[in-house]
């Protein structure tokens, strides 16, 4: 009995392998990666930062702040952006009344400054951030949309972000891929 696979011409097997490799290479890596759940909700790589964030029960304060600052259209746009997204618990660590004061219309400029300090142009995955930290001899500077830099450091597999005032937040959920960038969930609010 002859094995049909062995009898198939070598050229057709090679062509099939080449086609499979070419098709795989044509798809972005994010298509193969499963996004982590955030705030009890699935995050979809084909949705925007805003479309995903509104579903996270851990980011209701951030979403309300983004709306109050008028940044919904920006963060729904093409980007790409890297967003360091503070949780509700991170906002709760701020002095009492801070969030309520910031979301008032008269404080829109200050709120916008704080929120855009959490956004960096481009897609910076945790792996890319760690490579930049290594290249920088232990730290990397990222220029934010607000204009001031954030300092990124790492220890083991953890990534830390330090603001202009010296406060450090830990990335608790990394690489939440979006159609217009990436979100890294953090446990602190960064301040320029």
Where are these regions (language model features)?
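Bacterial N-terminal signal peptides that target proteins for export
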Residues: 3-18
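Bacterial N-terminal signal peptides
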Residues: 16-26
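Mature, structured domains of secreted/extracytosolic soluble proteins
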Residues: 2, 31-192
